């Protein structure tokens, strides 16, 4: 059994999610202790618990210690054979983080996985489902991955109530080399729920002004996501070309719609101008998949602590060895041997 110190690296829930997901796809048992030990609320939260239970379900595995607040977890996977699954975070916890774990675990599935996850689709400190659909999956498709995501209903903090549906097809991953970017357009979606429609419109207009000012071809769809539960707003932007880059900003009380749009636009513009083909978020998301294929090399605009942590976990669980050229906080080339 592989033993992982949950306080290692970034020390958050990603350690548990990535460890269990890689354990499932490599058929290796894992024990994680000190889970989120340095966080103000240590142990497993609702979204982390949902993620590890989802990985166990789809891999026909067994869990010990899967309780709210648990500081230690043991996981022994079975086989990922496919099937239909439903998971509910029960709060505004991130559906995107749950899907991230499922997607890694499903990388070697023998059959199609049809999964629905309920919770928050557009929440802080997590990839939005738009980002997964428009950035993560297109980049992974370059490695042979096959999946599609549909947002059935958006969910914002604190009420949640969102629902996302994903279908993941059996696939054979292949190595990737991605070191330069060629961007030809920017697309996006600006959305709001139970707020005046001009909120989403102003978010989009603010983003377009900045991006068009930089000479980019920009089109941002405005979506009225109004429904029976909660309210909120946000915008997800992505750059299209030989790769995908993405940026997200969410609204909150007292935050002007123009600021929401400009935040995402300026972050995306920085990613584009870096010349790197992976943004700072995809730079860590791709690492478990690189560990599964080997012989891959990518460049990211920023080496983050999350990326470094994923490298440590991937090396421990898969036995692969990574080499990094660059320093944390700056651009870097990541290679797996």
From Swiss-Prot:
UniProt KW ATP-binding keyword: yes
Leader peptide range in chain numbering: none
EC number(s) stated in the UniProt entry for this protein: 6.5.1.4
UniProt-listed GO biological process terms: RNA processing
UniProt-annotated location(s): Cytoplasm
An example Gene Ontology CC term for this record: cytoplasm
UniProt keyword ATP-binding, yes or no: yes
Alphabetical UniProt keywords: ATP-binding, Cytoplasm, Ligase, Nucleotide-binding
Binding site for ATP: 100, 281-285
InterPro entries: RNA3'-term_phos_cycl_insert, RNA3'_phos_cyclase_dom, RNA3'_phos_cyclase_dom_sf, RNA3'_term_phos_cyc, RNA3'_term_phos_cyc_type_1, RNA3'_term_phos_cycl-like_CS, RNA3'P_cycl/enolpyr_Trfase_a/b, RPTC_insert
PROSITE patterns associated with the record: RTC
Family recorded in the similarity comment: Belongs to the RNA 3'-terminal cyclase family. Type 1 subfamily.
Name of the featured protein: RNA 3'-terminal phosphate cyclase
Lineage: Archaea, Methanobacteriati, Methanobacteriota, Methanomada group, Methanobacteria
């Amino acid at each position: 059994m592989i033993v992982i110190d949950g306080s290692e690296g970034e020390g958050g829930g990603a350690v548990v999610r990535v460890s269990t997901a890689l354990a499932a796809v490599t058929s290796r048992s894992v024990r994680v202790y000190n889970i989120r030990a340095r966080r103000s609320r240590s142990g497993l939260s609702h979204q982390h618990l949902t993620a590890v239970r989802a990985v166990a379900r789809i891999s026909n595995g067994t869990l010990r210690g899967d309780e709210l607040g648990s500081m230690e977890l043991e996981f022994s996977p079975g086989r990922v054979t496919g099937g239909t699954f439903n998971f509910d975070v029960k709060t505004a916890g991130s559906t995107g983080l749950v899907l991230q774990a499922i997607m890694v675990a499903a990388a070697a599935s023998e059959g199609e996985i049809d999964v629905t996850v309920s919770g928050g689709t557009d929440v802080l400190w997590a990839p939005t489902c738009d980002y997964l659909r428009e950035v993560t999956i297109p980049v992974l498709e370059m490695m042979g991955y096959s999946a599609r995501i549909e947002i059935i209903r958006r969910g914002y903090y604190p009420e949640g109530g969102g629902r996302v549906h994903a279908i993941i097809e059996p696939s054979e991953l292949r190595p990737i080399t991605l070191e330069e970017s060629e961007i030809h357009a920017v697309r996006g979606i600006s959305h709001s729920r139970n707020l005046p429609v001009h909120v989403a419109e102003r978010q989009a207009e603010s983003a377009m002004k900045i991006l068009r000012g930089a000479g980019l071809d920009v089109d941002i769809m405005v979506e009225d996501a109004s429904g029976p539960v909660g309210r909120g707003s946000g915008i997800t932007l992505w750059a299209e070309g030989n790769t995908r880059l993405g940026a997200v900003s969410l609204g909150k009380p007292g935050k002007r719609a123009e600021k929401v749009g400009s935040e995402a636009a300026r972050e995306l513009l920085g990613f584009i101008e870096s010349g790197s083909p992976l943004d700072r978020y995809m730079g860590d998301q791709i690492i478990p998949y690189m560990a599964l294929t080997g012989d891959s090399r990518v460049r990211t605009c920023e080496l983050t602590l999350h990326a470094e942590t994923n490298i440590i976990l991937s090396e421990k669980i898969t036995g692969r060895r990574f080499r990094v050229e660059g320093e944390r906080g700056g651009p870097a080339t990541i290679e797996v041997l």
